[in-house]
């Protein structure tokens, strides 16, 4: 007798941030696809407005809508609520009380943006072609600087804690290797990745 897969997903975005459907549509699809558990994890508010993160004035609606849907579909699927929270710097990260005090089931910690040498916030969560342009424009083509900045932020995020899941840990891995084919064979990068995933494991994620 074949073993049936236990379908779950805890990283999803709806119309409260940059998702392409409303919360209930995602839940209905998860049920129709046979999921046993599903998590909603919109992008958390940042200290400034963006096109892809939730605003604080939407938080109450976000939590209330989830609560209503959790009750509505309680006999069909386990639903849990979270946020994907960015580490931006030592003043903006998942461990802040403003995020810890929210009634969430879980939190995802992620890095989507870096500071350029001039202090400009640069979104590096982009398609590979756009990533190349951003590295050239804001970092003078210094891919090594971008890589070290990204992973240093992740190490700081791990030390601060305040989350349950590390978000898309391969984000830089893909874009950087497209920018510089052969990167994955460079010893320093291989050692950096090994240290990163070892640190994740040591922190219990």
Spans of model-derived segments:
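An N-terminally biased module of ancient metal coordination in phosphate/nucleic-acid-related enzymes
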Residues: 2-89, 94, 99-101, 105, ...
